[in-house]
């Protein structure tokens, strides 16, 4: 157990998966839509410490109807500074507005903002175009929020995996090798469903 595990988060059960993705994919760019207190951002940043990649955490840091209205910005910055996380860049902004000027290809896109159908759809439509062909998109809370699950079910043209623990994690990739690696490494550890392309 380390300092990251002291952060209360519904994402804690996905830590090993995030570390696996970074180790397997060697991503140059990870984008996280929704930082909150930073658990998943810190996990990715920590996993990147011996690599060249960067995680960009994007958030307004105002909270929302699901998390409650709260400002976590200073807490996130303090953890970045106190734990020397050099592989993370925080962008304070609206997801849609930031996407309008975004110009980097993305290896891992993590969608974990407002959990309404419209918001998740908007995040996907604005950001999935930047994901590289061998990349991956992950949606948190596909079990905890029906509207996230409904949108995830509607997305087509990707291999889908669906973890059921820790509020659920929906996974999209067009990379069959990565899909198979995930199945081989996690089928004995977690319950999940596999859907074809």
Regions found by a protein language model. Give the residues of each.
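S-adenosylmethionine/decaboxylated-SAM
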Residues: 2-197
């Amino acid at each position: 157990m380390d300092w990251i595990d002291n952060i209360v988060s519904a994402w804690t059960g996905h830590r090993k998966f995030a570390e696996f993705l970074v180790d397997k994919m060697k991503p140059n760019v990870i984008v996280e839509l929704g930082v909150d207190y930073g658990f998943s951002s810190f996990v990715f940043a920590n996993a990147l410490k011996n690599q060249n990649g960067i995680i960009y955490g994007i958030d307004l840091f105002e909270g929302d109807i699901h998390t409650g209205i709260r400002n976590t910005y200073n807490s996130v910055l303090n953890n970045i500074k106190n734990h020397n996380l050099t592989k993370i860049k925080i962008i304070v902004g609206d997801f849609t507005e930031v996407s309008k000027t975004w110009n980097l290809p993305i290896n891992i896109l993590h969608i974990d903002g407002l959990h309404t159908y419209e918001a998740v759809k908007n995040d996907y439509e604005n950001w999935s175009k930047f994901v590289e062909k061998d990349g991956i998109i992950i949606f948190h809370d596909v079990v905890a929020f029906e509207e996230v699950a409904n949108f995830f079910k509607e997305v087509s043209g990707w291999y889908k995996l669906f973890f059921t623990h820790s509020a659920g994690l929906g996974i999209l990739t067009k990379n069959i090798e990565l899909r198979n690696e995930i199945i081989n490494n996690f089928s004995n550890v977690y319950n999940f469903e596999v859907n074809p392309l």
